Amino acid sequence: MNDIRSRKIAVLMGGLSAEREVSLASGAAVCQALVARGFDALSVDVARDLPLVLSREGIGAAFIALHGRYGEDGCVQGLLELMAIPYTGSGVLASALAMHKLYSKQAFVSAGILTAPFHHFRRGERVSLSHLSFGLPLVVKPVQEGSSVGISIVKEESQLAAAVKLAFRHDDEILVEQFIKGQEVQVGILDDRPMGAIEIVSRNEFYDFEAKYTDGMAEHFFPARLEKGLYEEALRVGLAAHHALGCRCYSRVDLLVTPAGECYVLEVNTLPGMTALSLLPEIAAKGADLPFEELVERIILSADLSVKTG
């Protein structure tokens, strides 16, 4: 929308999810960048009075810097659609699909995109190796959480019960996936084009919450250490996953690239982190020569509504 520069912008941050602290850091960085680029922006710590706050402050556009439940799952997007406030990132449906790991995996399978074999369980259902079509090792995760919250790698049968209990602590539905061994590669998307792919080598067993948000807990390699043809394939698969869910403007797609050269999609992050340690800003800077402030400006200028009214 061409008149975004003249509007008062709310940077939506914090919120009610398990990723609240990360969101506060993302929001603070985004708000500072918007002000530095000359926008009239204020930070809003999202609570249940959000509609009143947006109306009272005369907000004309929103930069969504929320992560996890209520912010990344289509809830806030639906509210902003009802209030006719243009917002950044994907719309209601794409946000909900990306946040729900079962439905996103089904969309990937339908689009011919590789994703790890999986089984879905609801609270109260028995989870045992005999119920699975694959063996150890495996991954147990909540259906709807981000930042690797509630995820476990299970290498021995004795670890399964604790992993299932942890995942159900965060959701009423869980996925049990076949463990795929490979390089952890993340593709950054902006304006519906891939900017590049970065490789992550975690000091922990996998790229978990601690490794994502603690300085020094992971090494980053840009571009990802893949031969040229495989690197291009990773970019293609990342963009295909973005499109398979109907995402808008920007996202970060997490992949595993196997020694056999297969690219498995883990998930699509419709509202990737925007902190000093976050991967999308690093990919933008190194892959598209786009400093953080310019990245934030590009994103806010893409703010829009999915439902157009006359």
Swiss-Prot record:
Binding site for Mg(2+) 1: 254, 267
Pfam families: Dala_Dala_lig_C, Dala_Dala_lig_N
GO BP annotation list: cell wall organization; peptidoglycan biosynthetic process; regulation of cell shape
EC numbers for this chain: 6.3.2.4
Cofactor(s) demanded: Mg(2+); Mn(2+)
Keywords for this protein: ATP-binding, Cell shape, Cell wall biogenesis/degradation, Cytoplasm, Ligase, Magnesium, Manganese, Metal-binding, Nucleotide-binding, Peptidoglycan synthesis
GO cellular component terms, semicolon-separated: cytoplasm
Catalytic activities: 2 D-alanine + ATP = D-alanyl-D-alanine + ADP + phosphate + H(+)
Superkingdom of origin: Bacteria
Keyword Repeat: no
HAMAP family cross-referenced by the UniProt entry: Dala_Dala_lig
This protein's name: D-alanine--D-alanine ligase
Species the sequence originates in: Pelobacter propionicus (strain DSM 2379 / NBRC 103807 / OttBd1)
